[in-house]
Amino acid sequence: MYQSPRRLCSALLLRDAPGLRRTLVPGPRRTLAPPVLGSRPASPQLQAAASGAARSRPRTVSPMGNGTSRLYSALAKTINSSAAAQHPEYLVSADPEHLEPIDPKELLEECRAVLHTRPPRYQRDFVDLRTDCSSSHPPIRVMQWNILAQALGEGKDNFVQCPVEALKWEERKCLILEEILAYQPDILCLQEVDHYFDTFQPLLSRLGYQGTFFPKPWSPCLDVEHNNGPDGCALFFLQSRFKLINSTNIRLTAMTLKTNQVAIAQTLECKESGRQFCIAVTHLKARTGWERFRSAQGCDLLQNLQNITEGAKIPLIVCGDFNAEPTEEVYKHFASSSLNLNSAYKLLSPDGQSEPPYTTWKIRTSGECRHTLDYIWYSRHALSVTSALDLLTEEQIGPNRLPSFHYPSDHLSLVCDFSFNEEPDELL
């Protein structure tokens, strides 16, 4: 039976929060933070928030051995298989008949009701990086974010200073949506997405986004009891601004073996200017001791992108959680690639050459971890960064670090505005 978008999204919200009907009556409510400096006027499509997904439960991790043995076991089982073959049920497109716009005001009120006991969202400002105002078209806003898989946050990541209540999905998903809506990205690149089909795809599609999801073949989320399926990478773009020309799902290889890490690369055409570019999202292998493995994965991704962009003829933006500090080989491969890539967040440093001190900050049982692992790379000769969202300060993050009641992930979102450089034929 057909359900209106309003009724359907309300049902998704209420399914996760059986007590929400009581919170929707008049009472104290958490208000959304005012627009951040540099944000754009909200369009009707980007004024909504909503939620929906599986009920949050205590998670039990299945004994699967250590990370090394588990990965090699997975590799041995999947050398001749693909992620799509492993999880075809997670690659089915939603019924387009139901993809109608959300009523923004009512759904935003529902999200506010869910979050009414939470402290306000962190405030972050955009830094103006323009050197001129020559572009005749609006910039392209790109958001990169590892949103923290729900199964991992509750089951495996052991955030010892984060209250269990702060990880409840019925509230955390609303914080994630609030962050996305606050910055209104034209393109959204996400990692650790394990609620694509029941939350992000149905809601973002009603905001005008077209989405693609590529799960990890052997996601660690599947080891957690009551999981919501595998996590993976997701890429969304606004259909009002871009036309999809080509889309490629990439299962990364290392040392000739297919690995558990993936990427999505899409060639888009700007409807305003007719200019084309490639946007890619990835999530490389985590943990200390896997530096050479990440390096091999990065080289494989660069080779794939070289082919897709026809040897840098098509401008490129690469977003990802690389799980690698700037001192690692995989970072150096991207910085020295023939694709002429630059890291956007270096531009926030005084000399324009240094990465931020951190993009993730957490406390686990093994100790406190503060690292720079997330990046937005771009074709320096074809594109310019006109602004970038500043990072949270240590004082804002607080002594218990991330995630928290204020912020839904252990990784900070990165947001940049890009403009095409003029005279592309000469620059390329």
UniProtKB/Swiss-Prot annotation:
GO molecular function terms attached to this record: 3'-5'-RNA exonuclease activity; metal ion binding; mRNA binding; NADP phosphatase activity; NADPH phosphatase activity; poly(A)-specific ribonuclease activity
UniProt GO cellular component terms: cytoplasm; mitochondrion; nucleus; P-body; perinuclear region of cytoplasm
Domain of life of the native organism: Eukaryota
The reaction(s) this protein catalyses: NADP(+) + H2O = phosphate + NAD(+); NADPH + H2O = phosphate + NADH
Annotated region described as Interaction with PPARG, given as residue ranges: 340-350
Localization (cell): Cytoplasm; Nucleus; Cytoplasm, Perinuclear region; Mitochondrion
One GO BP: regulation of circadian rhythm
Ranges of compositional bias, category Low complexity: 39-55
Names of the cofactor(s): Mg(2+)
Keywords: Biological rhythms, Cytoplasm, Hydrolase, Magnesium, Metal-binding, Mitochondrion, Nucleus, Repressor, RNA-binding, Transit peptide
EC number: 3.1.3.108
Predominant location: cytoplasm
Binding site for Mg(2+): 192
Chain spans, region Disordered: 21-66
Cofactor remark: Binds 2 magnesium ions, but the ions are only loosely bound to the protein.
Binding, substrate: 192, 216-218, 260, 283-286, 321-323, 411
Annotated organelle transit peptide span: 1-72
Pfam families xref list: Exo_endo_phos
Entries under InterPro entries matching the protein: CCR4/nocturin_mRNA_transcr, Deadenylase_nocturnin, Endo/exonu/phosph_ase_sf, Endo/exonuclease/phosphatase
Family: Belongs to the CCR4/nocturin family.
Job description of the protein: Phosphatase which catalyzes the conversion of NADP(+) to NAD(+) and of NADPH to NADH. Shows a small preference for NADPH over NADP(+). Represses translation and promotes degradation of target mRNA molecules. Plays an important role in post-transcriptional regulation of metabolic genes under circadian control. Exerts a rhythmic post-transcriptional control of genes necessary for metabolic functions including nutrient absorption, glucose/insulin sensitivity, lipid metabolism, adipogenesis, inflammation and osteogenesis.
Alphabetical list of PANTHER family matching this protein: CARBON CATABOLITE REPRESSOR PROTEIN 4, NOCTURNIN
Subunit details: Interacts with PPARG.
Protein name, entry field: Nocturnin
Organism: Rattus norvegicus
